[in-house]
Amino acid sequence: MAVVAPTAREENVYMAKLADRAESDEEMVEFMEKVSNSLGSEELTVEERNLLSVAYKNVIGARRASWRIISSIEQKEESRGNEEHVNSIREYRSKIENELSKICDGILKLLDSKLIPSATSGDSKVFYLKMKGDYHRYLAEFKTGAERKEAAESTLTAYKAAQDIASAELAPTHPIRLGLALNFSVFYYEILNSPDRACNLAKQAFDEAIAELDTLGEESYKDSTLIMQLLRDNLTLWTSDMQDDGADEIKEDPKPEEKN
């Protein structure tokens, strides 16, 4: 029996998985971009969608962490009056910000040109619109002035569009709907400095999911309850922060592989 050669799409998906195992995040992004760009009007499978999300989350996550560390060092050196060090740090921070901008621009372009227009199901529409909101939010984390305002407005627009579809088409316990609520509430808290709205959104999502927990299927039970726990963690943190100035880590929607 003749062996059927894998298609270019299958080969790129396999190579993306290989790059993931090898922790070669940039290459993983490249392979999944090839898959996305080769589809025409066809949609990515759930597996492909998750691989793309993981690839970009790994690449952006490392640089977001670097930016936070460097910004913290910059503040300390500024308070000590070490101008020479501050100038060097600013140059380095600027380099990281350029990399962050490039990564965000890359995935946002792919989302607008391919992924969002070809999405047909409710969960894929919400998935990609949430992703669009996430990457505009990452831009808002470090941009300033008019650029920050623009990034924040784009985040809000994408999250609201995703929320409208999620409310109409996805169950309150659906992990994608819960992940959207988690990240949307983080946006209100961190970018818009609106703890009340952040807490209200997170609490509503948590309460609605709790009310329907008995209808949750076995396959998404683990994913959904994990995100519900993260919503509760943030609510606990934010309500205590309103009373004192805590500095614990705010939780965001984990990568698909972290839910397993």
Curated annotation (Swiss-Prot):
Q: Name one Pfam family in it.
A: 14-3-3
Question: What cellular-component terms does GO give this entry?
Answer: cytoplasm
GO BP terms: namely: protein localization; signal transduction
Among SMART domains, the record links this protein to: 14_3_3 (SM00101)
Q: How does it assemble?
A: Homodimer.
Q: Would you identify the family this protein belongs to, as annotated?
A: Belongs to the 14-3-3 family.
Name of the molecule in the record: 14-3-3 protein 3
Q: What is the lineage of its organism?
A: Eukaryota, Viridiplantae, Streptophyta, Embryophyta, Tracheophyta
